[in-house]
């Protein structure tokens, strides 16, 4: 199964942004995509759209031992990992006064700790090959805050410091480390918003529209290309002007 194509691991590839990014990469025909999901149902979805351009693998990204076993399988069957895209994430929204410890811990574990586990699982191989791309999907919420999302914003902003430090560690090895921070993107979740809710969100976006999954996947494609070899330690904001650093 080893191939001359680049090997990309994408977490949470069964729906939303992860699915869109995985499809974009697989359509280049020079990237084999390994998409992860927490369920067998999700893996079937991944296998269906990837066809011969990759596979879906069931993986709990909060379990270091499971990650080790999965990555051993990847290295044995594909030889290496050239690209890691940390996309999977969850929300457990509540005002802090009502937030349970479990709500806090679960979001920090999936949205922050798992990125440590996944990144650590690939960097030794990338260092050996003297090249690699690590990209993590962040959020505009990390930079502007949002009521009911202290856990989510803390995790996503924590990733910024993590990636800047990791970028410094890996830059001499030829490995780039970057983040994409989307604003409000049109997904299944936003399709369920009422017109009143949608209008409220759009009032905060100067471009007066939602972003698209395609726009995020195209930026991801650029960041993993050789055209972005001199870009590292950056957060690329894609939010229609909602936040301007």
From Swiss-Prot:
Pfam families: adh_short_C2. InterPro entries: NAD(P)-bd_dom_sf, Sc_DH/Rdtase_CS, SDR, SDR_fam. Its EC number is 1.1.1.100. The keyword Lipid metabolism applies. It comes from the Bacteria. It catalyses: a (3R)-hydroxyacyl-[ACP] + NADP(+) = a 3-oxoacyl-[ACP] + NADPH + H(+). GO terms for molecular function: 3-oxoacyl-[acyl-carrier-protein] reductase (NADPH) activity; metal ion binding. Pathway: Lipid metabolism; fatty acid biosynthesis. Substrate binds at residue 139. NADP(+) binds at residues 12-15, 38, 60-61, 87, 152-156, 185. Disulfide bonds: none annotated. Belongs to the short-chain dehydrogenases/reductases (SDR) family. Homotetramer. Catalyzes the NADPH-dependent reduction of beta-ketoacyl-ACP substrates to beta-hydroxyacyl-ACP products, the first reductive step in the elongation cycle of fatty acid biosynthesis. Calcium ions stabilize the structure, and may inhibit FabG activity by obstructing access to the active site. This is 3-oxoacyl-[acyl-carrier-protein] reductase FabG.
């Amino acid at each position: 199964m080893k191939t001359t194509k680049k090997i990309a691991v994408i977490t949470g590839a069964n729906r939303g942004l992860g699915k869109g990014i995985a499809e974009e990469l697989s359509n280049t025909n020079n990237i084999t995509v390994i998409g992860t999901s927490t369920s067998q149902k999700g893996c079937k979805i991944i296998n269906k759209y990837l066809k011969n351009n990759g596979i879906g693998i069931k993986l709990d990204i909060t379990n270091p031992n499971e990650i080790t076993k999965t990555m051993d399988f990847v290295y044995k069957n594909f030889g290496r990992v050239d690209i890691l895209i940390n996309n999977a994430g969850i929300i457990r929204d509540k005002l802090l006064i009502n937030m349970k410890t479990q709500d806090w811990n679960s979001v920090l574990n999936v949205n922050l700790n798992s990125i440590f586990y996944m990144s650590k699982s690939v960097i030794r191989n990338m260092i050996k090959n003297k090249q690699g791309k690590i990209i993590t999907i962040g959020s505009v919420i990390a930079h502007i805050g949002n009521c009911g999302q202290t856990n989510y914003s803390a995790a996503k902003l924590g990733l910024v410091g993590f990636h800047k430090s990791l970028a410094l560690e890996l830059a001499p090895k030829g490995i780039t480390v970057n983040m994409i921070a989307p604003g409000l993107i049109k997904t299944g979740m936003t399709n369920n918003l009422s017109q009143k809710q949608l209008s409220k969100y759009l009032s905060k976006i100067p471009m007066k529209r939602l972003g698209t999954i395609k726009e995020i996947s195209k930026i991801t494609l650029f960041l993993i290309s050789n055209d972005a070899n001199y870009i590292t330690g950056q957060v690329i904001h894609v939010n229609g002007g909602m936040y301007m650093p």
